[in-house]
Amino acid sequence: MRLRHKPWAKEYMEAQEHVFIQHPEQLKGNWSTEFGNDHPLFIEVGSGKGQFILGMAKQHPDVNFIAIELFESVAVSIVQKLVETPMPNVRVLTVDAKRLVDYFEAGEVDRVYLNFSDPWPKTRHAKRRLTYKTFLATYEAILPKAGEIHFKTDNRGLFEYSLQSMSQYGMFFTEISLDLHVNEPEDNIRTEYEERFSALGQPIYRMEAVFRPKN
């Protein structure tokens, strides 16, 4: 997907201090202060334009959500939506997922969502996949013991790779679906990509994976 450059995005987001966090490293260990409560904290890595995370935040007002989207030209769409329809339990970051440990203390995040991540199909790019072992170690470092990853994709290759990567890492699966929309849960929040690929008849793959507590 080719990203459309939006030169105004950075300045616009920085003006929305109640939504966009410019220096998340300053909040490491203190996100409950930012939200003004100690509700569970869920993050989505690769939030796109925010349809999923905003839907989740509306559905679960007693949970705090952080949308993480590397590209400002994409993340600005989330910020705009939050300006139009304020949601006090959502914040937005434009940071690299490799550095999550710089922004969250161990156990500070209660759940990680990975939705329709870039599959990076070439073998030489495997390390860039968000379910590669180094990324799994990063998520494990900020989640509590037995922390969860919820994952959705339309790409069977990435799904099979992720099952293998997580299994080899020592994780176990509490749910696996090879066609989510056959018996779609009532509370499922669809992403933009999910709606698009489902309309084309493409099955949606989903799993919930849990880290095994280490002694």
From Swiss-Prot:
Pathway(s): tRNA modification; N(7)-methylguanine-tRNA biosynthesis
Assigned keywords, A-Z: Methyltransferase, S-adenosyl-L-methionine, Transferase, tRNA processing
One cellular component term from this protein's GO annotations in UniProt: tRNA methyltransferase complex
SUPFAM superfamilies (alphabetical): S-adenosyl-L-methionine-dependent methyltransferases
Catalytic activity: guanosine(46) in tRNA + S-adenosyl-L-methionine = N(7)-methylguanosine(46) in tRNA + S-adenosyl-L-homocysteine
Record bears the keyword Phosphoprotein: no
CDD domains: AdoMet_MTases
EC numbers: 2.1.1.33
Domain of life: Bacteria
Residues of the active site: D118
Catalytic EC class: transferase
Single GO molecular function: tRNA (guanine(46)-N7)-methyltransferase activity
Keyword Aminoacyl-tRNA synthetase recorded: no
Coiled coil ranges: none
Family matches, as Pfam families: Methyltransf_4
Binding residues annotated for S-adenosyl-L-methionine, in chain numbering: E44, E69, D96, D118
Amino acids binding substrate: K122, D154, T191, E192, Y193, E194
NCBIfam families listed in its UniProt record: PRK00121.2-2 (NF001080), tRNA (guanosine(46)-N7)-methyltransferase TrmB (TIGR00091)
Function: Catalyzes the formation of N(7)-methylguanine at position 46 (m7G46) in tRNA.
Family of the protein in this entry: Belongs to the class I-like SAM-binding methyltransferase superfamily. TrmB family.
Stated name of the protein: tRNA (guanine-N(7)-)-methyltransferase
Lineage: Bacteria, Bacillati, Bacillota, Bacilli, Bacillales
The gene coding this protein: trmB
